[in-house]
Amino acid sequence: MSVNFKGNPVDLKGNVLEVGAKAPKVSLKAKDLSVVEIAKEDKVQIVLTVPSLDTPVCASEAREFNQKIAAFKGAEVIVVSMDLPFAMGRFCSTENIDNLVVASDFVAKEFGEKYGVLIANGALEGLLARAVFVIKDGKIAYKELVKEITEMPNFEAVEEFFKGSGSCCGGCGCH
């Protein structure tokens, strides 16, 4: 699988998980170095992957989801990158990001590898491609892999999913 960075193809390590697949459990580091668990069976999680919060597009994406989080009632929104937890904390403080969780995959790159979004070559090698996963009941309920890393994900599609057209089957306020 590949995506583009500024129009040039870059490969991803592994296979991107598809809707219906079991979501692998992964432990990441929060900005305060606590553990963030991905694929909790008792929560609906919206997981956004970005190369780095220190880039304009990634920062805009985090701000946008931070503002629109009310549309995803009952869901936990988590932004995952390879940024160091300290840098993530500084970003959240500077940008007043307080409605979502930031988590780093820098320790083992386990999320990137298991979810198929780890960039394997090119200028961004070792970072994460831009993607959105909704995890419900331990499975991938929604997925968007953004084909051009420098572009934003489709916010409207995620909102529509939670309004019921893609329906996450309840428990998250989408009905």
Residues covered by each model-derived region:
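Chalcogenol-based redox active-site neighborhoods
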Residues: 1-175
